[in-house]
């Protein structure tokens, strides 16, 4: 709901993501974003975790520098709009989906147009 609302404001582009690595919990993506997974215990394959950390930290660095997370080694990340509902999935594979979990979103906020 908040993502759609921010996209409607026509300010800076909005980039939405879901972190689905292993048994992820709230804030579990932080060590991946800052590329310091060696400082914490992470579930899953270590090589895959390092690969994901490289992708995520590159995207966040690109975004901090340019306002756009796209760059070498990162799947094309479209800004979120109501018409595309683009969401980047960060997991063993990193990929972009459109209209992610729309049925679930409709259940959570049935009167809101996503």
Please identify what each model-predicted range represents.
Residues 1-114:
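C-terminal helix-and-tail extensions that cap enzymatic domains
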């Amino acid at each position: 709901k908040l993502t759609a609302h921010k996209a409607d404001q026509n300010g800076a582009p909005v980039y939405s993501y879901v972190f689905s690595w292993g048994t992820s919990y709230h804030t579990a993506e932080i060590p991946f974003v800052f590329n310091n997974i060696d400082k914490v215990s992470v579930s899953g394959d270590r090589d895959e975790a390092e690969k994901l950390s490289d992708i995520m930290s590159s995207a966040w660095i690109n975004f901090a520098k340019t306002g756009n997370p796209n760059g070498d080694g990162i799947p094309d990340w479209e800004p979120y709009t109501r018409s595309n509902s683009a969401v980047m999935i960060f997991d063993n594979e990193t990929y972009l989906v459109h209209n992610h979990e729309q049925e679930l979103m409709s259940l959570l906020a049935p009167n809101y147009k996503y």
